[in-house]
């Protein structure tokens, strides 16, 4: 359950933003069902019961998960499956590690902050993924359809909207290598490198695949708040067709004594791509780092700070001859309390600034800041 939102903002651009006041956002809820179909075979089914973007219940995705394949008669398959997990269906794209800590509709329990990255790397796509665990190393390989909603329609490259498409619904290829180790009783390390590539999928949503909505309610819109205005505070670089992205993540946790720990999570990302109506590939990059201090008998409390900055090359604005570069910077300070293992509350102050946007844009010289309170239940 989410509650308590208040924002201030400044925008000297020609467009005026919708005035805001303090208030509550509607609750969001998710439902996860994991069914054991057979020994080592599971069906994972995920529903959004209610969200900002879709107020009604609808399916997020579902997939078969194989940890054993005893229906195959070969011993070597049993040996392989001791180290391997296979997923087939529609699932979260396993690009980077940031999606493990993001808020996803009603599931905000694992995010110590209120919001996700400015460039929010999240999509559900149809495909297959293989995870191999060998010692402290994890190797991930996947292929998907490269889009949220599948489309079998032949691509018409004579149309302006798809003029620069290669005319093919290309798959997306995802890879990850991670090292995750509890070095000793006090120190844990996880480092990973990931990549995502599609030669052209026309409707790719790697940076715009969330269908639930931001937790910064109402900011940065010049139209009345509705379920269509749900990406507040985020930025999509518009790589709807060709996409090549790489991400590095580093997680460190130091626990010198019982009931106290320091943890840090850092993301470095570089991406390039274009829409099907663009001739040139554009670039974007993002850097995010946070520090969280946990304390209390069972680390029931925490305080944290996050810095997020991104830059992106954008196509020429309407009426303008040249490309332009934008950057957005965010600072967030948060605190939280795990009242039980299933119930938590958190509060965050955020300040976000926009630079380099065209004069016709509501982001030109824009800034918002404010305080948000949120309650979360997971069971």
Stretches with model-predicted labels:
Residues 99-102, 153-154, 203-207:
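Short aromatic-enriched loop/helix-cap "lid" or pocket-rim segments at secondary-structure transitions
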Residues 1-2, 13-149, 167-185, 190, ...:
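Outer membrane beta-barrel
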Residues 1-12, 227:
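Short alpha-helical hairpin
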